[in-house]
């Protein structure tokens, strides 16, 4: 290492049981996002191992881990392609981990499924499949991102302060949707938040990190 090198995370020993909804809270610089980035494969780890459902993913590149992990970021613009239609974004999410050809057409059964899932949001988007994602509000886009991240029922759902950029009312709606989807699919979830009230309200486990 170098003289300016700083250890971001050390001595982390975390085990999540299937269906655990674990909230993580801590101040700036505590390593919350670093923890999620390490699990997702964005940052390599120097020692130890990361296992998802008995599969060692420690050396697995980020794009391969995406098969097991769903993730929603803080920025509502990150999780969706703004220049593509709602239906095209949903197709990409539906076919994650599969070979994508040049055909964008989807089956009637897929369209019915998309409408059914979008109806859960209560935003009227089930009738706007051809709308361009970039024309939607931040809350609408984040709701769709959450839907996309949970569509294939990932082994692990990572939520990186996914309501921090939203206004209070929209943030509450997205949190309620999160709770509903996690419960519906019994998803093992790790959610970072700065809000102690939210950390206590949601999930069955709470982790506090300090810098």
Descriptions of predicted regions:
Residues 25-27:
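The feature captures the beta-strand-to-loop junction immediately N-terminal to the Walker
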Residues 40:
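Helix-to-loop junction immediately C-terminal to a conserved catalytic motif
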Residues 48-56:
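Conserved ABC transporter NBD signature motif
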Residues 56-70, 78, 100-103, 107:
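ABC ATPase NBD coupling module
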Residues 157-160:
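Catalytic Walker B motif of ABC-type/P-loop ATPase nucleotide-binding domains
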Residues 206-211:
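H-loop (His-switch) and adjacent beta-strand-loop-beta switch element
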């Amino acid at each position: 290492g170098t003289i300016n090198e700083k250890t971001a995370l050390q001595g982390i020993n975390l085990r999540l049981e299937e269906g655990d909804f674990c909230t993580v809270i801590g101040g700036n610089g505590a390593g919350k996002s670093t923890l999620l980035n390490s699990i997702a494969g964005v940052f390599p780890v120097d020692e130890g191992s990361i296992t998802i459902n008995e599969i060692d993913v420690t050396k697995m590149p980020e794009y391969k881990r995406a098969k097991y992990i769903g993730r929603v970021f803080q920025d509502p613009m990150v999780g969706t392609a703004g220049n593509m239609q709602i239906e095209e974004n949903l197709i990409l999410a539906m076919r994650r981990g599969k070979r994508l050809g040049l055909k964008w057409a989807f089956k009637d059964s897929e369209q019915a499924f998309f409408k059914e899932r979008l109806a859960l949001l209560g935003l009227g988007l089930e009738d706007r499949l051809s709308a361009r994602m970039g024309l939607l509000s931040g809350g609408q886009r984040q709701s769709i991102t959450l839907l996309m991240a949970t569509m294939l029922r990932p082994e692990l759902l990572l939520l990186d302060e996914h309501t921090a950029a939203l206004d209070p009312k929209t943030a509450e709606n997205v949190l309620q949707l999160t709770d509903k989807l996690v419960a519906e699919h019994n998803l093992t979830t790790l959610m970072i938040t700065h809000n102690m009230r939210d950390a206590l309200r949601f999930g069955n486990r709470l982790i506090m990190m300090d810098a």
